[in-house]
Design a protein with these regions (language model features):
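Mature, well-folded catalytic/scaffold domains that follow N-terminal targeting or propeptide regions
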Residues: 1-205
Length: 205
């Protein structure tokens, strides 16, 4: 576990925003979420932080979102999880916050394309020329930002996720020459998001 730097004040937006995406603060994030999950219902913590973290779920190969969602998925039906399960939720949220990384562009959902059409406008990258971590260089990739911004507003979150997973499953099948792990995550992360939808404000979608 990384050493703590200094506590994150969850009520101070300037402070916690400066720590988003800073993995060296992962332990600080963990302590913040542990504290909040002791003081508040876990559903309320997700409702508060979900809209903040969703735009940056791409970071850490989407593992923050996936870990958080699967922690919730394993909660008992009476929604009264054990201390160990609550701590796993805190760890998932902390990893998500520490690896927070939004995609380039401003996906304000004012575009006109569904996800499958937007995919057709994405530029192609030679896997052999990819350097650095996954996603490195996307800001400078011609056409990528405009493709992200071309997405239309989703009127139904569940349907939008289904469209997304189906579209990227098609990409995975159509391109066996591409390393599969990144593409698999474009399917598994949105699918995992289904577990959090009941606690995310609908206006986010």
């Amino acid at each position: 576990m990384l050493p703590r730097k200094h506590p994150i004040d969850g009520s101070n937006e300037t402070e916690w925003r400066s720590a988003l995406g800073d993995y060296s603060r992962a332990t600080d994030w963990l302590e913040l979420f542990r504290e909040q999950l002791k003081e508040r219902r876990w559903q309320d913590v997700i409702t508060n932080w979900g809209p903040i973290l969703v735009p940056g779920y791409f970071g850490g190969l989407t593992h923050g979102l996936t870990r958080t969602a699967h922690a919730v998925r394993l909660f008992p039906e009476d929604a009264n999880p054990s201390e160990v399960q609550i701590d796993e939720l805190a760890r998932g949220l902390a990893y998500w916050a520490g690896t927070y990384r939004p995609l380039p562009g401003n996906p304000d959902r004012h575009g006109r394309f569904e996800v499958d059409e937007a995919l057709r406008h994405l530029p192609r990258v030679d896997p052999g020329k990819q350097k650095g971590p996954l996603g490195a260089g996307l800001n400078d990739l011609p056409g990528f930002t405009s493709a992200v911004e071309s997405l239309a507003a989703a009127t139904d979150a569940e349907e939008a996720i289904s469209r997304h997973t189906a579209a990227f499953a098609g990409v995975l099948i159509a391109h066996p020459e591409v390393p599969p792990i990144p593409l698999v995550h474009t399917i598994t992360a949105p699918a995992a998001m289904q577990n959090l939808l009941p606690y995310i404000p609908r206006e986010l979608g």
